[in-house]
Amino acid sequence: MINISLSDGSVRQFEKGMTIYEVANAISMSLAKQAIVAEINGELKDLSTVIENNCKLRILTAKDPECLEIIRHDAAHLTAEAVKELFPETQVTIGPAIENGYYYDFARDKPFTVDDLAVIEAKMQELAKKNEKVTRELWNRDKAIEFFRSIGEHYKAEIIASIPTDEPITLYRQGNFIDLCRGPHAPSTGFVKYFKLMKVAGSYWRGDSRNQVLQRIYGTAWATKEQLDHYLFMLEEAEKRDHRKLGRELDLFHFQEEAQGMVFWHDKGWSIYNIVEQYIRKKIRKNGYTEVKTPVLVDKRLWEASGHWEKFRDNMFALEADNKILALKPMNCPCHVQIFKQGIKSYRDLPLRMSEFGLCHRNEASGALHGLMRVRSLVQDDAHIFCAEEQITDETVSFCKLLTEVYKDFGFTDIKVKFSDRPEIRAGSDEVWDKAENALKEAVEKAGFTYTLNPGEGAFYGPKLEFVLTDAIGRQWQCGTLQMDFVLLEQLDASYVAASGEKKRPVMLHRAILGSLERFIGILIEEYAGCFPLWLAPVQVAIATITSDLNDYALAVQKALIDNGVRTDINISPDKINYKIREFSNHKVPLIAIIGKKEKENKQVTIRRLGTTDQQVLSVKQLITLISEENSKYL
């Protein structure tokens, strides 16, 4: 007999040599029916696994989050099985689970079409309903290679040949389909119930553009119908909110081939950009930051001294002038250190908070570019805090407070913090890392945040905090960072005079709240679905006349608004008022000021707010006051 410790804390005895499924069935027949995989001593296993020794056992069902990846991997195999039945000449390659779904890469001469996807999905439903048994088989390496070659699956044969000789070769069989896989998998195809094929894209064998072009089918799979429906709804919402689409529709910005990854800001988009910058500038000034400006083009000698040339060279744009190699800066920190080094710094000067809206350039691969979210030319709301070790906690608490205020003003209240601690390869002593990590942890807790730990994910030069926002449709965006740095000031020989009179190295805190302005504006466009709050809207008030004889009054109202800093648009054309209202509403202007004869007589306007038919009559002065008061809260 063997002792099995179960997840409820009980310990039960079973015959040695029973499978996990048999144990589950002995506990409860309903549990055995629902079981997908199990965890033995922390390792996921198939239900067919034989238990030979005492162990800790967790039997997992669709309710357990660990099973979602299993279901998605099962769905990938089901996709491959369906493709092989429908298109037997197609070769299968790999099909992993990924975030929110899975993909499977196929080699075939003819691309899959949208119609093909519908047929494949229908076949998958059919195979799932058959509830085919899934079995794990251990194969001899040479036999497996020979088998896959014999059935024309040369990619699978190549994968097996590349597996280290000390690793077992395991295949999974379901119906007439067999695939190479480490597993584990559910006991039958019937556990894959709620899925959808999403799209087809091109890929390369082993991710190398020199290799064969493959056809990648993306799918999504979930444990329940509700989860699937929610995900599809979220995708639909995300498509409606896509900042690239709204950027065109609202005339905010565009991109073109002649300047890949560089934004062409239109007047309305640039207005938003400047408002965001103005807002951040006001916040940091109130929090004791100085603002500086450093060169965009810097001799490579500085990048060599800082270590960036060695580690970041491939992502830097460089050029030659006057027999020197110059590089467009990819980040601001080495330049900020140069300002810190001008003149003697004393402990009385610390903490020194140095900010810059620094224009940076990064040579991102063209395939990685994605609207405002991933660009080659970007401006960061970057700052570096030079402080003494004993000031780290207070500075971090202060930063967390500022960051929370900023996010709240933009409508983000769900903030998660990730703490990345020391990696295996790192600079500095364990004692220094202990101090740094403890200071950050203490600060985060003082600021009222809980955090999740990313073990070993800190940079080699210091631990890091990452701040993650959740948007209106549940997506998460990592924006803010606070990174401690023990190395750069050593490399660039920056110091201050301590109270004792000796020279000491300050600690450097790299920090950003928005990240890049471009990306954050992209997030804002999607968060608000283009309907910006009044203080942030590129056009705050649009004036629409009912008849042409009111144009002079409308122009006078516009001038009064502009003179008081209100961003306005106007339509005094002969078009009907309903058309004007519809056009301004389509451009998501928060306030529409309607002017008719009565409004002119009373020196008033009738205000209609975006998204409602309710109307409010205001004097021009009242309208200016309303907007000015709203602006003053933020700007």
Swiss-Prot record:
Domain of life: Bacteria
EC number assigned by the record: 6.1.1.3
GO molecular function, a single term: tRNA binding
Residues where Zn(2+) binds: C333, H384, H510
Subcellular location as annotated: Cytoplasm
Keyword annotations of the record: Aminoacyl-tRNA synthetase, ATP-binding, Cytoplasm, Ligase, Metal-binding, Nucleotide-binding, Protein biosynthesis, RNA-binding, tRNA-binding, Zinc
Ranges where the TGS domain occurs: 1-61
Protein's name according to its UniProt entry: Threonine--tRNA ligase
Organism for this UniProt entry: Rickettsia canadensis (strain McKiel)
Gene that specifies this protein: thrS
